[in-house]
């Protein structure tokens, strides 16, 4: 496995989010794209609806489908006051104002948009999306959790850098997955056509496939593939690729037919 397979995973975070995270004593200063964001009341949502989402912070975002962009917030007052929003090209950015990551509680942001094709999660927050489509792209950098209830995409490019978790169900034609660290991809209910997997560290992943699966594992990570996939692996360390053939449940032999009961004797003649 070449190192560029791991480094490429950080490209969506840089290109899509344009985020600079600078650690400080009192928290973190976040800038998404060319803007540090504005309160929700000041966000101009008159343009085209975004198709990409960036969350930088400890808050929770719930994404549902709808004809137009709509955003509502709830939760702890301090967290709500600290939220900052930005719209940059096709991306909606959600973060907090400088030095307000700690001791403010947690906010829940509900976003309605026509389509979600890419998301980036930086930090310890959570994203739950009803669906993703087309050429889906997911990047998790940190300890956050992202979930897609229904995936129906031609391809999925998934990167987990850190200890974050990803969960998905549905189907994708092609899966390109990179895990760098101890992250987990829990996708047992995701049917994949073909897959190319790279793991560096102790990360784990599970998905289903009947196609070609190629894995490169450096470390102690474990990849589990359910189905009838054609699997190949190159490993350095104790990492494993487990391809488990899953067939339809065996109905077993038919139960034996109960024997016929004895016939009743004829009645004697009078």
Where are these regions (language model features)?
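Acidic (Asp/Glu) and glycine-rich low-complexity loops/linkers
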Residues: 2-12, 21-122, 126-139, 150-159, ...
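Tandem repeat domain/solenoid detector
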Residues: 118-126, 137-145, 155-167, 174-186, ...
